Every structure is written in structure tokens, then in C-alpha cells.
From Swiss-Prot:
NCBIfam families: rplX_bact
Superkingdom of source: Bacteria
Name this protein carries in UniProt: Large ribosomal subunit protein uL24
Keyword vocabulary terms for this entry: Ribonucleoprotein, Ribosomal protein, RNA-binding, rRNA-binding
Biological source species: Proteus mirabilis (strain HI4320)
Record PANTHER family: MITOCHONDRIAL RIBOSOMAL PROTEIN L24
InterPro entries, alphabetized: KOW, Rib_uL2_dom2, Ribosomal_uL24, Ribosomal_uL24_CS, Ribosomal_uL24_KOW, Translation_prot_SH3-like_sf
HAMAP family: Ribosomal_uL24_B
GO BP terms, alphabetized: translation
Keyword Cell division in record: no
Role according to the record: One of two assembly initiator proteins, it binds directly to the 5'-end of the 23S rRNA, where it nucleates assembly of the 50S subunit.
Length: 104
């Protein structure tokens, strides 16, 4: 099945502590999760690695979020939208369900 949310898509968070925030998808994981830029930040306690000249400390990084908790953001309407699929010139393309506009 084709992916409704892909890398570089702008998404909006539907539920959780970051509800309403927008960001770009950095990575789509096979476990049904996505990593979104600037969303679901967690503090990671990192040990120093002298061999790589890497300092230790507390680092903030993005954690994965369920793909069902995000929706693609439609810039034309300014709201979250649903994704549909259709064939154009023999190719399967994604489109916004609200205004039938093709995605990228």
C-alpha cells in the first residue's frame, strides 16, 4: 500500500502535548511512526565518547510519534487534510481530499 505521509511532507499534530504544532517529516519508520522536525522533543542523557571527540551531557532530540496522530497540512486551506490516491497519466499520485489538489 502506498504511504499517505511521506518524508518532507508538512504535517500538523492532532493529539498529545504538541497538538496543533506543524513541522516537516524527517523520517518515516516501518513501525507506523514518523519523526517530525521540532515535535515530541525528549531529553537524552548521552555519555561522552572520547574516541570520537564527542562530549557528553543532556541532549534534546525528536522522538517518534504515531502516524495516526499527525495529518498532512494543506497550505491552501490552512488546515489538516486527508490524503487520497488517483491515477494521472498512468502514474499514481496523492491529492488533498478537501480541494482535490495534487500533492507536490
Amino acid at each position: 500500500m502506498a504511504a499517505k505521509i511521506r518524508r518532507e511532507d508538512e504535517v500538523i499534530v492532532l493529539t498529545g502535548k504538541d497538538k496543533g504544532k506543524r513541522g516537516k517529516v524527517k523520517q518515516v519508520l516501518s513501525s507506523g511512526k514518523v519523526i517530525v522536525e521540532g515535535i515530541n522533543l525528549v531529553k537524552k542523557h548521552q555519555k561522552p565518547v572520547p574516541a570520537l571527540n564527542q562530549p557528553g551531557g543532556i541532549v534534546e532530540k525528536e522522538a517518534a510519534i504515531q502516524v495516526s496522530n499527525v495529518a498532512i497540512f494543506n497550505a491552501a486551506t490552512g488546515k489538516a487534510d486527508r490524503v487520497g490516491f488517483r491515477f494521472e497519466d498512468g502514474k499514481k499520485v496523492r491529492f488533498f481530499k478537501s480541494n482535490k489538489e495534487t500533492i507536490k
